[in-house]
Curated annotation (Swiss-Prot):
It comes from Granulibacter bethesdensis (strain ATCC BAA-1260 / CGDNIH1). Keywords: Cytoplasm, DNA damage, DNA excision, DNA repair, Excision nuclease, SOS response. Belongs to the UvrC family. Its main location: cytoplasm. Residues 42-120 form the GIY-YIG domain. This is UvrABC system protein C. CDD domains: GIY-YIG_UvrC_Cho. Gene3D superfamilies: 5' to 3' exonuclease, C-terminal subdomain, GIY-YIG endonuclease, UVR domain, UvrC, RNAse H endonuclease domain. Residues 231-266 form the UVR domain. Interacts with UvrB in an incision complex. PANTHER family: UVRABC SYSTEM PROTEIN C, UVRC/OXIDOREDUCTASE. It is found in: Cytoplasm. The UvrABC repair system catalyzes the recognition and processing of DNA lesions. UvrC both incises the 5' and 3' sides of the lesion. The N-terminal half is responsible for the 3' incision and the C-terminal half is responsible for the 5' incision.
Length: 644
């Protein structure tokens, strides 16, 4: 395939002001589109349909902007969904690109960022964990990594579908290759082996139980295994075990035998043959009841790195092929694609999608729909998982809707609540105070909408009202602004607010919201019963006398889960904040010492005490520490001393 003459990784629109942007003249519906046609070039690009508030209704790409946009003027040929979109269009924006492949990448980025109402939108706000092997230490560390891969002296393998999947792999690497997982600072301060050495999951390089050369051999074996050469490693270990037995080194032979068993176990649980699959993502879609589930299996080096289910938002008119095509473009917007994507359906413009992903990756990316053999079996396995996951979700949604209908009836809401917000706070005698908001609705917990509030104002120990006031003022003051700006703010407005407490808390919160100008939110306070027994809660709400629910009422269980989730989130948030405070050291009081330099110092000297005792020359020799910074550190710990 001839690669297009364009950058290897096309810049996003926001980062590329040189891309020509054309705005439509004022109008509405077909009128604004017809007026726009006079300005459009016969070139590739991306177009956006906007409503009266400037919100994106639809984002599309085209080989020829002029021809593609012209198709929207033929209303009678459009499906009902696009007819409604055209009728709501008040303005348009056009961005031209170098190639159609670049337009496809930009379209996927804009859809993911703007979430237009009439597009298929991938709801995926999670980052994916990777396996990282450090390379800037004599004895490399293996660990889980999440986030940007900015550490140059490190190798990465992944992605993995979940933290569980990568943790399982780390455990396997410890058992088979005896690699250390401790931090550099812990490594530098060990005086005897840790428990992992006792259970044969580490070779204890921290206390010289293994030479640097032998450890390097283990690292090389681990790299080979992660690259799909497990069979080769197994043969090599078998040879080493035989040699140890012949030399009557039975303890060493037994240790190697245990490593072979671990390797055999890992390979025996693999679902694919490394020789036939290698590096690929297996992607299958299943549709039912107007909804879709997309299952992605991550295969790297012939190993199954786990799978994850996605539920893209779309209308019931979208086909499985439509959903799969939109999913692939958006899914790889912020992550590198593997060389092979195995699909259960062909998608529209499959060659163009392959070209765009190849452009992004800087190498060939193939999209393939297998019809026989092991690859077909793997795709069928992913398809079965997609079907079963969607069946579970539909069943859960039906049950969730019944519970929400019960909540609406119980608290006299006009309709089933789409967004319930639950608030709680946590502190110890006024220290490290945090408030939290958790959100639930028809889809269950909306964890991307959870919020933490670090309480800024001075808090009198035990003054929970002051904490609640600050939290609600910040949340609803911002919410009012967002609500006035467009439909997204309206969608994020709660139908019901739950708080932990009784009549006093309910009255206080109503007073806070009245001061802000919020009068259309239903408030409910949940008070614990006598002896704080679960199941004997009292419910307080405006316009109703306090009441209890029957102990086995499903709605009672649901409301308890809402309250308990807010309490759990508040406790974990407070603990995280408290831990952050407790790990402060004297290094935090030195000007110019941020997180990166602090980490460099602790990794080099092992502790803040080691930094304090270090001489100026040793500080200047620390990687990442300039001479000026070293002098500042030395002067902090040795006031009055000359820094020669």
């Amino acid at each position: 395939m001839t690669m297009p003459d364009a950058p290897a990784n096309p810049p996003k629109e926001a980062d590329n002001p040189s891309l020509p942007i054309v705005e439509a003249p004022p109008g509405k519906g077909v009128t604004v589109i017809e007026a726009m046609l006079k300005l459009l070039p016969d070139r590739p690009g991306v177009y956006r349909m906007l409503d009266g508030q400037g919100e994106a209704l639809y984002v599309g790409k085209a080989r020829s902007l002029k021809k593609r946009v012209a198709s929207y003027t033929q209303i009678h040929r459009l499906p009902e969904r696009l007819r409604r979109m055209v009728s709501e269009t008040v303005s348009m924006e056009i961005v031209t690109t170098h190639t159609e492949a670049e337009a496809l990448l930009l379209e996927a980025n804009l859809i993911k960022r703007l979430k237009p109402r009439f597009n298929i939108v991938l709801r995926d706000d999670k980052s994916y964990p990777w396996l990282m092997l450090t390379e800037d230490h004599a004895f490399p560390q293996i660990m889980k990594h999440r986030g940007a891969q900015t550490r140059k002296a490190a190798s990465y393998w992944g992605p993995f579908a979940s933290a569980w999947a990568v943790n399982q792999t780390v455990t396997a690497m410890q058992r088979i290759f005896l690699l250390r997982s401790c931090s550099d600072s812990v490594f530098a301060n060990r005086s005897r082996p840790c428990l992992l050495f006792q259970i044969r999951r580490c070779s204890a390089p921290c206390v010289d139980r293994i030479s640097q050369e032998d450890y390097a051999e283990l690292v090389d074996q681990a790299r080979a295994f992660l690259s799909g050469r497990g069979t080769e490693i197994q043969r090599d270990l078998a040879r080493q075990m035989e040699q140890a037995a012949e030399a009557l080194e039975f303890e060493r032979a037994a240790a190697i035998r245990d490593r072979i068993r671990g390797l055999t176990h890992v390979q025996g649980t693999a679902v694919v043959n490394p020789a036939s699959i290698g590096n690929a993502d297996v992607i299958a879609v299943w549709q039912d009841a107007g909804q879709s589930c997309v299952q992605v299996f991550f295969i790297r080096g012939g190993h199954n790195n786990g799978n994850r289910a996605f539920y893209p938002a779309h209308t019931s008119a979208e086909t499985a092929q439509d959903v799969l095509g939109a999913f692939i473009a958006q899914f790889y917007d912020d992550k590198p694609p593997p060389p092979l994507l195995l699909l259960n359906h062909t998608i529209a413009e499959q060659e163009l999608v392959s070209e765009a992903l190849s452009l992004k990756a800087g190498r060939r990316v193939e999209l393939h729909v297998p019809v026989r053999g092991e690859k077909r079996a793997v795709v069928a396995h992913a398809e079965t998982n997609a079907r079963e996951a969607l069946e579970r979700k539909l069943a859960e949604s039906a049950g969730q809707n019944r519970l929400l209908d019960g909540v609406a009836e119980l608290f006299d809401l006009p309709t089933r609540p789409n967004r319930i917000e639950i608030y709680d706070n946590s502190h110890i005698m006024g220290t490290n105070p945090y408030g939290v908001m958790v959100v639930a609705g028809p889809e269950g917990w909306n964890k991307s909408a959870y919020r933490k509030f670090s309480i800024r104002g001075p808090i009198t120990p035990g003054d929970d009202f002051a904490m609640m006031r600050e939290m609600l003022e910040r949340r609803f003051s911002r919410g009012l602004k967002e609500r006035a700006e467009g439909p997204e703010g309206e969608a994020n407005w709660p139908d019901l607010v739950l708080i932990d407490g009784g009549a006093g808390q309910l009255s206080a919160v109503r007073g806070i919201l009245d001061e802000i100008g919020v009068t259309d939110v239903k408030l409910v306070a949940i008070a614990k019963g006598p002896d704080r027994d679960a199941g004997r809660e009292w419910f307080h709400t405006e316009g109703q006398a306090p009441f209890q629910l029957p102990p086995r009422d499903p709605v009672l269980y649901y409301l308890q889960r809402l309250r308990d989730e807010a309490h759990r989130f508040a406790i974990t948030t407070h603990r995280a904040g408290r831990s952050k405070t407790l790990v402060r050291s004297e290094l935090d009081d030195i000007d110019g010492i941020g997180a990166a330099r602090k980490r460099a110092l602790l990794n080099h000297f092992g502790s803040a005490r080691g930094v304090k005792q270090a001489g100026l020359a040793a500080l200047e020799a620390t990687p990442g520490i300039s001479k000026e910074t070293a002098r500042r550190i030395y002067a902090h710990f040795h006031p009055g001393a000359r820094a020669d």
